[in-house]
Amino acid sequence: MSLNLKQIAVYGAGGFGRELAWLIQSCNDVEHYYELVCFIDDDEKLHGSVINELPVLGLLQSHAAFPDAMIACGVGMPKARVNVYNKVSDMGLNFETIIHPRVERSKWIEVGKGTIICAGSILYIAS
């Protein structure tokens, strides 16, 4: 793929991970910006399989195959998400923020690193 595209590995091959992969593909429909390279999953039984045309790898395998890839966290359970954050951060890897182009937001909204905001979301400041 083009060197201008940002490689993204989606951590989590379950429901939210697959939804996140679709969200990233939907972002690309508006402006081709990302290259989805794989799913990362801790379930070793999934390693080597293909889901929605993407290979499923372990974290170390993914980093070896795609050392420049940013991570998008597609893990829905809060405790598991914290564990993923710690594991990825401990390896010195970075999370990508994904904001769909059809998000409406105030210019005063601050979005943190690794945030995922889906299409149709409206963000505003309330008092």
Each PLM stretch: what is its role?
Residues N4-I24:
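Glycine-rich adenosine-cofactor-binding loop
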Residues E44-R105:
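Phosphate-bearing ligand-interacting subdomains
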Residues Y11, C27-G48:
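NAD(P)-binding Rossmann-fold cofactor-contacting core
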Residues I24-N28, V88:
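Active-site catalytic pocket residues across diverse enzymes, especially alpha/beta-hydrolases
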